[in-house]
Amino acid sequence: RVTYGGGRYHFDDDQETPDTGMASFDFGHCTAMWDQSSCNRRRSETPPFVSFYGEGGVLTTNTGQNYTLYDLDGKELERKSLPTSDAPHFANFVNAIRNGEKLNSEIGDAQVSTLLCHLANMAWRTDGAVDFDPAKRRLIGNPAAAKLWARDYRPGWEPRV
């Protein structure tokens, strides 16, 4: 189940995603929360972009190659900081298409995390909640969200599998 509360509170424009909100992802055995505010004038005093809270501690990161690991009392256990760049990821993707190179990250993994963003957006744009069957990969009981599941394509541009 995915729930979302929030809205467009800062800019009155045609953007289709909220500038402030919180998503809750209930996986049955655990819950993940996403809290964001892209238009708040006050920024966080600390630089982490994402924090993962687990049973044994907290991992904070601001990029894919920088992280800090803390125990439950806030004591720093480990820190890793490397220069980052998206260039190797883009090059790997292009080489996978052109030369059959193995992807550094499987496309299915990216699809799962992207799906969570889409489900949260569907929840926000409909009644605030979306139920999803991961085995069947189908929405459950939300006809308004189901209308957002796929798009209408112009004639001649329909995807063919």
Question: What does each model-found stretch correspond to?
Answer:
Residues R1-N66, K75-G108, T114-V161:
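Contiguous beta-strand/loop segments that form the cofactor/metal-binding neighborhood of enzyme cores
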